[in-house]
Amino acid sequence: MKVLIIGGEGYVGSYLFNHLFKQGIDVQTVGNRLSDYNLLGRIFLSSFTHIVLLAGHSSVLRCKGPLESPWKNNVRNFKNLVEKTDNRQTIIYASSASVYGDKDTKPLYTEEDISIDYVNNYDLTKVSLDLLAMKYIGEGRNIIGLRFGTVNGGSPVIRRDLMINSMVYTALFEKHITITNKHIKRPILSVRDLSRAVETMIKSKAASNIFNLASFNSTVESIANIVSDYTKVDITDNGDVPGAYNFAIDNTKFKVLGNFTYEDNLHSVVENVIECYKNKNPEIVIRNEYFQYD
């Protein structure tokens, strides 16, 4: 067993690499903002049993501009990766729960739900990515798609533009917590649960599938209240703004098929983020600008 993480120097990848290494897995990483995984060759890729694809345009704002760049990076490059590998290898790729769109029409969205209404370029690429993956799965390829909830938690490279990470950062260093759309629901996935889930898939040789991954569902208001309790910083409510995601997802499928238990909850994630900012000296990044990929 030999694992390659593409995008291993980013927020999720840097934590996942350390986690898999500590579990005794032979793991290697490639990919940063100056490299292009589309240039990886067949011979290099052939030495890995599992390839975890995290690289790409990773947020709505990274895709807010001409479609060509996020399409190439998120969809075309995935297609090329599949075609440079074979049936002996398993590809695990990062999808997103945003494929369910921005309409709160169900209590919980399952893997069988998907929205084809255009919302933004990011969602367009993720829906297309999942459809392409399902095509390859139907042809016998070993592919696992992971529809992440909003990932939060401490990491060697931490994104401070994500919900809990952002609230904790501003509470600790700017002494305020500012929220909008306090009633909206959001699935949250801790980076620790994410890494444990990927480990489980690798070790159990999980079959091709698409899974929702979320440690829990919560609301903006509930998250802000817990961050406020821990940091003793007041909350400023700026009311509602249009265009915000509002949904919750069902995480049962992987719990059952993967015999998996999510360990983190809202309190433990907030504690973990506080510990990271205060004591781990992480590289703090923001991924909220359009990324031009040629």
Question: What are the roles of these predicted feature ranges?
Answer:
Residues 3-22:
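N-terminal Rossmann NAD(P)H-binding glycine-rich loop of SDR-like oxidoreductase domains
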